[in-house]
């Protein structure tokens, strides 16, 4: 989700390490699915996005797919903003926060709560980060 330079973010592959326009996914999910917990991780070569709180019954993206894709293609340039290249807001995967989030996910899985409860618990752990 984090291209290292604009060439890696091109829709057509021109580099060995390539992300295409997947860098738009984080912003898209933040806007279209605010019910999810999103934690961008600063991993090499192109980062990861931890997504939690998924509900298999949620049809928001399915129902709005074409308008969402058109919106992000039309309004976002093909060149990622400097903040994306700089990985602003990304968390070191070895940080205590990531460890806590993964432990909480393990514990939550054992209890089987609803997706909104999962998101609430993870957001409480990461206050000030989202």
Segments and roles (model prediction):
Residues 1-129:
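S-adenosylmethionine/decaboxylated-SAM
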